[in-house]
Design a protein with these regions (language model features):
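Terminal, compositionally biased segments used for targeting/anchoring and flexible tails
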Residues: 1-122
């Protein structure tokens, strides 16, 4: 999965869905039985992803979240649950709707969500 690049001054409404799309598809594509190297790489990728966010407040909030609730990269299901909880925590803080886990999996496993940067994904 390639890195995301942001345009300077790009509004959150544009880059936010792309960021979530990247994070969730990374979790969905994660191996069911990862090696120690896979686990370390996933945590590094998530850390770099957080550091790359174009919004300073978002980087601060995301870094605080992963410091309190580190990514669980022990297996695919755990990483998916972590990404889902992280997204719901951000939505809760922003006063947005929460997604049930079943709806999350159905959405991010659907073909229409697999198109790069699909508008079908939140």
């Amino acid at each position: 999965m390639s890195a995301i690049t942001w345009r300077p001054g790009q509004p959150k409404q544009e880059w936010g869905p792309r960021a979530w799309h990247w994070l969730h598809l990374m979790a969905i594509n994660y191996p069911p039985d990862p090696s120690e190297n896979d686990m370390a790489r996933a945590r590094v990728r998530i850390g770099r992803f957080i550091q790359s966010l174009p919004c300073a407040d978002c980087r601060i909030h995301a870094a605080a979240y992963i410091a309190a609730v580190p990514p669980d990269a022990s297996d695919a299901q755990s990483l998916q649950v972590w990404a889902w909880r992280f997204h719901n925590a951000v939505n809760r803080r922003l006063g947005k709707r929460q997604f049930p886990f079943a709806a999350y999996r159905q959405l991010y496993l659907s073909e229409m969500c697999w198109a790069e940067w699909s508008s079908a994904c939140p």
